[in-house]
């Protein structure tokens, strides 16, 4: 007899297919484990699948030629000179990764209070876009729109009397987006979190005849502790004064995220993003369920660094943790993921067939 919720359940004798001795079994009509009994069976009923089409690969740029610099806080990630970024774009294409994202490390000598270098049509990002699109016009290129890689204070906007100026910053962001789009960028991705910037950028692009350039809005970007290694990578970690809580979102809020997403969609965003990723999967799900818009998540530098560091110390299976974390985004409703794991995950997917 077996006991279930205090009541006895009869066990019956069943014969095994291999002729072995009979064993007692519960009289169950439903056995979920039957669908998990073999890999082929698990594949047949799998609800979510990760493919290389789901990946966007962020690359960090640095001035110079034939340069690759390791980023200490992001094991396995490097800053790349433009020629090396072109090589990685070729690698992305061979791995069938559809899109790369570009982020610059700006020399301190080029940083100023206004982030002027952001609007230089020959800045590092624009150089890289032109070089990549010349060699590989069929790969998608996404460019970040924000001033923090270019300002001496490390903030995403202009500052006056200790406050971030919203409308004045938006005017600069429009100019930044235009030089990127004119260089050949396919997707403009404003990450600054200034109010009204999506509408202003859309208007600026359309007036310049760049109507086919897409906008992926960082619609729900939280003031997060998980950005630390990224700020190291772009050189703003040591320059940042204060925090970004007056423009990035409070990590306690999800209704606010929906309002932000709705605003960006109404202003002309073609796609929306939630950042960071794994700590905010609930937000990804709510956004996708509410708006049914192309929804992306950014597996940010801190998320990457945690897994990479733990794997490097032998504390977990790095490949399994990588793939599990990426699949979690798909399960939560994301249409794609920006991840520093993109090339490694693509290699893994290729070997899996």
Swiss-Prot record:
Q: Which cofactor does it need?
A: Mg(2+)
A Pfam short name: ALAD
Entry-linked Gene3D superfamilies:
Aldolase class I
Q: Where does 5-aminolevulinate 1 bind?
A: 231, 244
Q: What InterPro entries is this protein classified in? A: ALAD, ALAD_AS, Aldolase_TIM
Could you mention a single GO BP entry for this protein? protoporphyrinogen IX biosynthetic process
- What is the annotated quaternary arrangement, including any partners? Homooctamer.
- The name under which this protein is listed is Delta-aminolevulinic acid dehydratase
Upper classification of the source organism reads: Bacteria, Pseudomonadati, Pseudomonadota, Alphaproteobacteria, Hyphomicrobiales
